[in-house]
Curated annotation (Swiss-Prot):
SMART domains: PAS (SM00091)
Subunit and interaction comment: Homodimer. Component of the circadian core oscillator, which includes the CRY proteins, CLOCK or NPAS2, BMAL1 or BMAL2, CSNK1D and/or CSNK1E, TIMELESS, and the PER proteins. Interacts directly with TIMELESS. Interacts directly with PER2, PER3, CRY1 and CRY2. Interacts with BMAL1 and CLOCK. Interacts with GPRASP1. Interacts (phosphorylated) with BTRC and FBXW11; the interactions trigger proteasomal degradation. Interacts with NONO and SFPQ. Interacts with WDR5. Interacts with U2AF1L4 (Isoform 3). Interacts with USP2. Interacts with HNF4A.
Name of the protein this chain belongs to: Period circadian protein homolog 1
Gene Ontology biological process terms, A to Z: chromatin remodeling; circadian regulation of gene expression; circadian rhythm; entrainment of circadian clock by photoperiod; negative regulation of canonical NF-kappaB signal transduction; negative regulation of DNA-templated transcription; negative regulation of JNK cascade; negative regulation of nuclear receptor-mediated glucocorticoid signaling pathway
Motif (Nuclear export signal 3): 981-988
CDD domains named in the record: PAS (cd00130)
Gene source species: Mus musculus (Mouse)
PTM per Swiss-Prot/TrEMBL: Phosphorylated on serine residues by CSNK1D, CSNK1E and probably also by CSNK1G2. Phosphorylation by CSNK1D or CSNK1E promotes nuclear location of PER proteins as well as ubiquitination and subsequent degradation. May be dephosphorylated by PP1. Ubiquitinated; requires phosphorylation by CSNK1E and interaction with BTRC and FBXW11. Deubiquitinated by USP2.
Motif (Nuclear export signal 1): 138-147
Short sequence motif named Nuclear localization signal, residue ranges: 824-840
């Protein structure tokens, strides 16, 4: 045995003395004393009694003997007599007789020591007899020590006595190191975990644990004191399993029963502050529940009868808990570690593990060292997990199979980590025999370095060893050493894996990272494939988007993992379908004039979202272990997010939506609580009038223009987006993926096509060939490509930020006839494939057909046509009727609008679909009773229909029926981003909305004078915008539907900021009760009907640009709120009128109490705060000078003032008591920006270009947000006070 004790690896600090750890292979055959602690040894000191028995096979006993010999050389006569008794018992056990010293040196040494130990005054004869007796005992002990010396420590030419004494000294050091573990335990006694524990007596503890142990005869329980490390309780089964009497364990140190290589693992896994508390329930069921939830540790425990020549270690699975035990009635309760120990049997002996379940996994580094071993390997190989960690993989393989590892790693590199099966290999079990295993391998490609970070192996035992007891110690043999061929092969593999991965093959889900050159056609469409994709190319797109990932995650969560795997096995057929799709049974029956829509349709793209029960999709899948494992990790992360359970359930239902999934409970939720997670049935009506058979393009990859009904699948983005906020953990940007935005917001009339299409039929994206479609779902490549593309998209967004910010509505080209009306709607930019491409649409707009062109436009004014039908005639029960409110001029009277064209569709003002959020809606008695005729937006007379340059009416839209405007329910929620930490990222994307600023219908959008060229066309243009926006939202693809829902969230203006001051559609003035602003026009329709960006889930496309538009169109005299409808709630509140804020009472939070709670949490976490050791600090300080100063690097330590955006340090931060207290806690100064100023967001700075623009992305977002707020305050014209920045961030 050689080498230091690795106990510190399991946890805890390094020990001062170099503790010794024997090797893993005992040397049988050496005589050894009894393994169990006996009464004869109990009188010895704690350090020397049985402390050595915490070592492996032959080591523990030799250690104990060496301690006794060394102790006797420095102790008095009493110790000599005790040593004599022990030696006599050892002689009787080992049948050995004393012999004279082996050398004169040893003899003189022993003589000198005995003279010092036993000064005698009773005469020469008594002195000589005592000396002879001492020499005799010392030589006996030395001989016993030599017999226990491991073979590897016996070297030729070395003194056996010296080697024996050195070995004994090392054993003593280990015992002392073991004792320091207990001191560590006692120091952590005051941890909070030890405060709330139930106290048990020994009788109560035995009663509770007996229900455990009686269920499994291979299980016993033991309680170890954290203060002394001694056993205070052990169950009856321990004596049977360890073949010792129960009394033998009373008062013994538990670590002395463990194999030495397991001591460190045991202490590292039983830190008191990290252990669960033993439940208070007395039933075995409750205990079992806790038992299955906690992490176990594997250790070998010594056992065997006294007559055995040496100790035998048996493997156990220990599950630790912390509790308090009162040993006696008068004694105080002491914290103890309660261990439930279950013996591990060989998987090949009865009860055997079934052959099909003899599977385990491993993970090793590029240098072929085990990094992780599945605990299922223990009964199959005989090794405990800690035996293999850090050991070379090649050392355990058969010599003939070692060269195969080089070929395996080459294939891993070629396949970029893609899982693959390989021929069987032979693995050496602990008993020395080989196990034949079928193997599968995969690699994890680091997403940034593109190198293989580690290799995963999945192994299934094919042939069991001849000796089925894999825990049998191997035959005595020299300690295995690393052969030169093993070292050389490991170096070759390591050099091989240093190469970056270059492959176009799809990568594995479990992080087998992004590819260097993903194919444009066959690469799984990541969330940002659209960034560089050619939107105008009709080539076959990639088969899946990030939206599909979210849907698949919900399928797994709600349908079951196996069903999900089977559902992905076979691609559904590529069908052609009528626009109605599978939803004809539920599709707006009152709005379906075309009988062709009633034909049974072929399953469309929505079949991807159907439940996996479809028989054509059932097929076993080749999902690998890491794919399922990563899926499980994503699901666990989703469950940790604060998504309402109703929303999650809606997500599941929309993922597998069929005609029958509009369940009754969904219908019940219609009304004040809008249900937005439902599949939009009106999406089936997208091409209702011209029921032309259409092909469905596959979403993802390079998205071709999506038209009309091709969004059936993307309806799931209504709910799959709720999982995006959790899946963004894979990327750094707090926004939904670009392709998701495109899917949700794509409009057939605005997407640039390959060429102008004047055909009268609805424009359809060309159908890719069925061969190009391959259902991928949640695969490795989707997340990896998503990560890769998001990086580039994030940088591109900043590169184009200045140019997009400079765009003005005046520079927007007139829209094509029949599609674009009035100012360029924000919906246009939704078809761009990236932020960079969005500006192109201002310069070249593709003419679209004049036939039904359902384009999503802003709706700054309500439709001039009659209001929607009453609830009884509502085509879809889950749809919420909009709140019809008149818009009053400054003189207070409602203004009529010119009559709408006779071709206006019945769905002029359709009901919005919204996600299930609670909305507070004020009744309409706050306003004058509206007349039955439509309300107008301006008093300017309208002279005839608008010119074709502004728009061309859609002739296929008949007027809707009249209905009283009394629906009082409107979706009011603004959960666009719940955390102020995402404020700067939320504002980063606001600028691209510049082109939609004029049509945004802001609080005072129509108050200012319009350009003369637009004076006549403005009212009618707005009317048609309302009509087409409404029809588009009701009838177009589900991405526009989702856009409606999500934009409604963030654009509800004061409706959201004021918690429902008369509906999300209310304009600023009307929402606050100020009716003088005729400019409020129809922000009802605008905010509740035609929002086209997914703000609800973190995408922020528009508040900055809209702020400029609102400022330009607002007159100072108007009484409006200085905010833009798209702004987040904290920005709305900062600029809201006080009267509005009275209807939105934000819970008051005392800053002092909040800071006090934070300080208490910081104090509780202080002991767990990671700290660098002095050596680490010196080492880091030699490389980074800022480490020595305890500050951040200058490149990161950039702060900005919340008022001016400058780079000046915020002075208010230095005097803050919280920061001074943080310094007292010894925490690292990891401030991210402008202190408590609040407005600086995450980055906190205002970096202005160069390299800081890349490193301070968050700072840019913060400065853009500050500038947006500043612009609004200057141009809003309202005198309403703004809330402090601190209140903004707090709320």
């Amino acid at each position: 045995m050689s080498g230091p004790l690795e106990g510190a690896d399991g946890g805890g600090d390094p020990r001062p003395g170099e503790p010794f750890c024997p090797g893993g292979v005992p040397s049988p055959g050496a005589p050894q004393h009894r393994p169990c602690p006996g009464p004869s040894l109990a009188d010895d000191t704690d350090a020397n009694s049985n402390g050595s028995s915490g070592n492996e096979s032959n080591g523990p006993e030799s250690r104990g003997a060496s301690q006794r010999s060394s102790h006797s050389s420095s102790s008095g006569n009493g110790k000599d007599s005790a040593l004599l008794e022990t030696t006599e018992s050892s002689k009787s056990t080992n049948s050995q007789s004393p012999s004279p010293p082996s050398s004169s040196i040893a003899y003189s040494l022993l003589s000198a020591s005995s003279e010092q130990d036993n000064p005698s005054t009773s005469g020469c004869s008594s002195e000589q007899s005592a000396r002879a007796r001492t020499q005799k005992e010392l030589m006996t002990a030395l001989r016993e020590l030599k017999l226990r010396l491991p073979p590897e420590r016996r070297g030729k030419g070395r003194s056996g006595t010296l080697a024996t004494l050195q070995y004994a000294l090392a054993c003593v050091k280990q015992v002392q190191a073991n004792q320091e573990y207990y001191q560590q335990w006692s120091l952590e006694e005051g941890e909070p975990c030890a405060m709330d524990m139930s106290t048990y007596t020994l009788e109560e503890l035995e009663h509770i644990t007996s229900e455990y142990t009686l269920r499994n005869q291979d299980t016993f329980s033991v309680a170890v004191s954290f203060l002394t490390g001694r056993i205070v309780y052990i169950s009856e089964q321990a004596g049977v399993l360890l073949r010792c009497k129960r009394d033998v364990f009373r008062g013994a140190r538990f670590s002395e029963l463990l194999a030495p290589q397991d001591v460190g693992v045991f202490y590292g896994s039983t830190t008191p502050s990290r252990l669960p508390t033993w439940g208070t329930g007395t039933s075995a069921g409750s205990g079992l529940k806790d038992f299955t939830q906690e992490k176990s540790v594997f250790c070998r425990i010594r056992g065997g009868p006294d007559r055995d020549p040496g100790p035998r270690y048996q493997p156990f699975r220990l599950t630790p808990y912390v509790t308090k035990i009162r040993v006696s009635d008068g004694a105080p309760a002491q914290p103890c570690c309660l261990l439930i120990a279950e013996r591990i049997h060989s998987g090949y002996e009865a009860p055997r593990i079934p052959p099909d379940k003899r599977i385990f996994t491993t993970r090793h580094t590029p240098s072929c060292l085990f990094q992780d071993v599945d605990e299922r390997a223990a009964p199959l190989l005989g090794y405990l997990p800690q035996d293999l960690l850090g050991a070379p993989v090649l050392l355990f393989l058969h010599p003939e199979d070692r060269p195969l590892m080089l070929a395996i790693h080459k294939k891993i590199l070629q396949l970029a980590g893609q899982p693959f099966d390989h021929s069987p290999i032979r693995f050496c079990a602990r008993n020395g025999e080989y196990v034949t295993m079928d193997t599968s391998w995969a690699g994890f490609v680091h997403p940034w370095s593109r190198k293989v970070a580690f290799v995963l192996g999945r192994h299934k035992v094919r042939t069991a060893p001849l000796n089925e007891d894999v825990f049998t110690p191997p035959a005595p043999s020299p300690a295995p050493s690393l052969d030169s061929d093993i070292q050389e092969l490991s170096e070759q593999i390591h050099r091989l894996l240093l190469q970056p991965v270059h492959s176009s093959s799809p990568t594995g889900l479990c992080g087998v990272g992004p590819l260097m050159s993903p194919g444009p056609l066959h690469s799984p469409g990541s969330s940002s494939d659209s960034n560089g994709g050619d939107a105008e190319g009709p080539g076959p797109p990639a088969p899946v988007t990030f939206q599909q990932i979210c849907k698949d995650v919900h399928l797994v969560k709600h349908q079951g993992q196996q069903l999900f795997i089977e559902s992905r096995a076979k691609p559904p057929p590529r069908p052609r379908l009528l626009a109605t799709g599978t939803f004809k049974a539920k599709v707006l029956p009152c709005q379906s004039p075309n009988p062709e829509l009633e034909v049974a349709p072929v399953p469309d793209q929505a079949s991807l979202a159907l439940a996996p029960e479809e028989p054509e999709r059932k097929e076993t899948s080749g999902c690998s272990y890491q794919q399922i494992n990563c899926l499980d990790s994503i699901l666990r992360y989703l469950e940790s997010c604060n998504i309402p359970s109703t929303t999650k359930r809606k997500c599941a239902s929309s993922s597998s939506y069929t005609a029958s999934s509009a369940s009754d409970d969904d219908k019940q939720r219609a009304g004040p609580v809008p249900v937005g997670a439902k599949k939009d049935p009106s999406s089936a009506m997208l091409s209702g009038e011209g029921a032309t058979p259409r092909k469905e393009p596959v979403v993802g990859g390079t998205l071709s223009p999506l038209a009309l009904a091709n969004k059936a699948e993307s309806v799931v983005s209504v709910t799959s987006q709720c999982s995006f906020s959790s899946t963004i953990v894979h990327v750094g940007d707090k926004k939904p993926p670009e392709s998701d935005i495109i899917m949700m917001e794509d409009l057939p009339g605005l997407a640039p096509g390959p060429a102008p299409s004047p055909a009268p039929s609805p424009t359809v994206a060309p159908d890719p060939t069925p061969d190009a479609y391959r259902p991928v779902g949640l695969t490795k490549a989707v997340l990896s490509l998503h990560t890769q593309k998001e990086e580039q998209a994030f940088l591109n967004r900043f590169r184009d930020l200045g140019r997009l910010r400079g765009l003005d509505t005046s520079s927007v080209a007139p829209s094509a006839p029949g599609c674009h009306h009035g100012p360029i709607p924000p919906g246009r930019r939704h078809h761009c494939r990236s932020k960079a491409k969005r500006s192109r649409h201002h310069h070249h707009q593709t003419p679209r057909p004049e036939t039904p062109c359902y384009v999503s436009h802003p709706s700054p004014v309500p439709s001039s046509g009659p209001w929607p039908p009453p609830p009884a005639t509502t085509p879809f029960p889950a749809m919420v009727q909009p709140y019809p409110l008149p818009v009053f001029s400054p003189r207070g009277g409602p203004q009529p609008l010119p009559p709408a064209p006779t071709s206006v569709s019945p769905a002029t003002f359709p009901s919005p679909l919204v996600t299930p959020m609670v909305a507070l809606v004020l009744p309409n008695y706050l306003f004058p009773t509206p007349p039955s005729y439509p309300y107008g937006v301006s008093q300017a007379p309208v002279e005839g229909p608008p010119t074709p340059a502004s728009h061309s009416p859609s002739p296929s839209l008949p007027p809707p029926p009249l209905s009283p405007p009394h629906r009082p329910d409107s979706p009011l929620f603004n959960s666009r981003c719940s955390s102020p930490l995402q404020l700067n990222l939320l504002q980063l994307e606001e600028s691209p909305r510049t082109e939609g600023g004029a049509a945004a219908g802001g609080p005072g959008s129509s108050a200012g004078p319009l350009p003369p060229s637009e004076e006549t066309a403005e009212p009618e243009a707005r009317l048609v915008e309302v009509t087409e926006s409404s029809n588009q939202d009701a009838l177009s693809g589900s991405s526009d539907l989702l856009e409606l829902l999500l934009q409604e969230d963030s654009r509800s203006g004061t409706g959201s900021a004021a918690s429902g001051s008369l509906g999300s559609g209310l304009g600023s003035g009307s929402g606050s009760g100020s009716h003088e602003g005729g400019s409020t026009s129809a922000s009802i329709t605008r905010s509740s009907q035609s929002s086209h960006t997914s703000k609800y889930f973190g995408s922020i496309d528009s508040s900055e640009a809209e702020a400029g538009a609102a400022r330009a169109r607002t007159e100072p005299g108007d009484q409006v709120i200085k905010c833009v409808l798209q702004d987040p709630i904290w920005l709305l509140m900062a600029n809201a009128d006080q009267r509005v804020m009275m209807t939105y009472q934000v819970p008051s939070r005392d800053a002092a109490s909040v800071l006090k709670q934070d300080r208490e949490r910081l104090r509780a976490m202080q002991k767990q705060q990671p700290r660098f050791s002095e050596d680490q600090r010196r080492e880091l300080g030699a490389v980074h000078s800022w480490v020595r100063k305890g500050q951040l690097p200058r490149a990161l330590d950039v702060t900005a003032c919340v008022d001016c955006g400058s780079s000046v340090q915020d002075p208010g931060h230095s005097d803050d008591p919280l920061f001074s207290e943080l310094d007292g806690l010894g925490l690292e100064p990891m401030e991210e920006g402008g202190g408590e100023g609040g407005g600086c967001g995450v980055g906190g700075g205002g970096g202005d270009g160069g390299e800081e623009a890349q490193t301070q992305i968050g700072a840019k977002g913060s400065s853009s947000q500050d500038s947006a707020m500043e612009e609004e305050e200057q141009g809003g014209g309202s005198s309403s006070p703004a809330l402090p920045a601190e209140e903004n961030s707090t709320s």
